[in-house]
Amino acid sequence: MKILASDFDETIFFLDNEEKNKKNIEAIKKFISKGNIFCIITGRNYSDLKYYLTKYDIPYSYLICEDGAKIFNNVDYCLETVLLNPNDIKKIIPVLEENKSDFYLDDGYNKTNNYNDCVKVVINSKDEIEKKRIVDLLKNKGSYHIYASRTHVNIINNTVNKEKALKKLFNIENLDYNLLHVIGDNENDYEMLKNFHGVVMKKHHQRLDELKKEEVSSLEEYIYQIMEWILEKEISLFFIYFYRW
C-alpha cells in the first residue's frame, strides 16, 4: 500500500484541460481500487472543493482544505480545525479596508463575518505588484502566515501549512510516513515537498526549484510510477518467499 497526497489545482484539476482531468481521475480511481490511500490537499475551502469533486466524480480517502486548516476523512467528517486568532483578524481588517482591497473571511466552508470562526482571510487579486504590496503591508503584524497564490493573497494561522496538516492527519489516523508520497506545483506546497518524498509538476512555482525534486508532466504519470514500484516490490517479495520455501 502507498499513500499519495496531491495538490488540487494545476495538479489534479485544470480549468482548461478536460482531457488531462479525465486521465488524472481515471488514475486516481485505479490507485484507490488497489487499496491505496489518496489525499487531496488544497488551499480551497471544503464547499468549493466538494463542488468539483462531485461534478467530476473524483474519489478520495482524505481531504485537507484551507492549506491545512481543515482536515476531513472519506465521509467528510472534520477531524481537525485550526482557526485564525480573532485579535489578528482585528488588526488585518482595517489595513485591508484602508487599502480598498476586495477580501472576505472564510470559515472553511463559506464566507463569514464571525471573527471567532474564521480559518482564513482571502484577498482577491491577480495583480502581482498589488499582491506583493498587500503581503508587505500585513507581514509581521500578528501570529499568522501570509502568502500570495495565483489569484489571491491568503492569511492563515502561522501553525498551519500542508506539511503540518499531513503530520496531524498521520497522527490522528495512525498512518505510516514511510508510505507517503506527495505532489504539487505551487508555493503553498513547498513545506510538504521539502519534508516528504515526492515530485513537482513540470509547470511549477519558481520557489520549488530550490528543492531539486523530480519533475513529472502529470499526476497520472506519477500515480502509474508509484503503482509500478508497488508491483515490482510485490514480485520481488514473491520470489524471495518462493526461493525460501
Region locations from a protein language model:
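Mg2+-dependent phosphoryl-transfer enzymes with acidic/Ser/Thr/Gly-rich catalytic loops
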Residues: 1-3, 156, 163-245
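Conserved Rossmann-like nucleotide-cofactor binding loop
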Residues: 11, 46, 188
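Short, flexible loop segments at the rims of nucleotide/cofactor-binding pockets, characterized by
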Residues: 14-18, 40-41, 81, 158-159, ...
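Short amphipathic alpha-helical segments
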Residues: 17-18, 51-54, 134-135, 194-195, ...
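Active-site phosphate-binding/coordination module
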Residues: 19-109
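Conserved acidic, metal-coordinating active-site core of Asp-based
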Residues: 95-195, 203
